[in-house]
Amino acid sequence: MIVLKWLFFTISPCDAAEPWQLGFQDAATPIMQGIIDLHHDIFFFLILILVFVLWILVRALWHFHYKKNAIPQRIVHGTTIEILWTIFPSIILMFIAIPSFALLYSMDEVVVDPAITIKAIGHQWYWTYEYSDYNSSDEQSLTFDSYMIPEEDLELGQLRLLEVDNRVVVPAKTHLRIIVTSADVLHSWAVPSLGVKCDAVPGRLNQISILVQREGVYYGQCSEICGTNHAFMPIVVEAVSRKDYGSWVSNQLIPQTGEA
């Protein structure tokens, strides 16, 4: 078992932040892929705007230097240029905004009939997960707490401050619904590779839909300052095949059924 765990941690693909990383993590959901594509498209326009503004600035500094123009020109009003610098930025903003609308609405889209519903409950300073679709008894669902693994207990291949004792296991290529809430203060359930960041508010249920397109391990953290140990609330989502997911659920339900 130890050998298998070591092989899993060293061979399985992991999506987590890397030192000196400037770009996005690899996308694992359609939403995250859309965010990356939108970023690249907008960045192209931003480069054009930057070059244009720098050209105007350098040209003004070069041609209107005080040594070349000892007596400055006094221009107090220019209707044409005022119209131009109002219309053109508006058009540019429209070209930037319109492509983002489809992505924005798709992020709020709720799957009518998800295959699995998982409830994530934030605590100071750990997460509780409930798989309400699988009942081990008439009153109890598949529930477990997820704590960060201390640095001294990490195994080979595990990531510092990002590993947990119980991962959120989900099937890949399956529509999921995540219901996020909090038991005490504000938290935020965020996993960058999945394109997910949902606030956990006490007394409120926030809902997000996820479709993980590939198997792997995805790391996130609480993204809302929630107290002293805010930085020690990692989130680990493990996407597996449907067959492996079914085996995991069965193994999780057996001990809970025995306790009941």
UniProtKB/Swiss-Prot annotation:
Cellular compartment(s): Mitochondrion inner membrane
Transmembrane segments: 42-62, 87-107
Membrane topology note: Multi-pass membrane protein
Mitochondrial intermembrane face of the membrane: 1-41, 108-260
This protein's record includes keyword Oxidoreductase: no
Alphabetized UniProt keyword annotations: Copper, Electron transport, Magnesium, Membrane, Metal-binding, Mitochondrion, Mitochondrion inner membrane, Respiratory chain, Translocase, Transmembrane, Transmembrane helix, Transport
Binding positions (Cu cation A1): H187, C222, C226, M233
Catalysis: reaction(s): 4 Fe(II)-[cytochrome c] + O2 + 8 H(+)(in) = 4 Fe(III)-[cytochrome c] + 2 H2O + 4 H(+)(out)
Complex formation: Component of the cytochrome c oxidase (complex IV, CIV), a multisubunit enzyme composed of a catalytic core of 3 subunits and several supernumerary subunits. The complex exists as a monomer or a dimer and forms supercomplexes (SCs) in the inner mitochondrial membrane with ubiquinol-cytochrome c oxidoreductase (cytochrome b-c1 complex, complex III, CIII).
Family named by the database record: Belongs to the cytochrome c oxidase subunit 2 family.
Record protein name field: Cytochrome c oxidase subunit 2
Gene name of this polypeptide: COX2
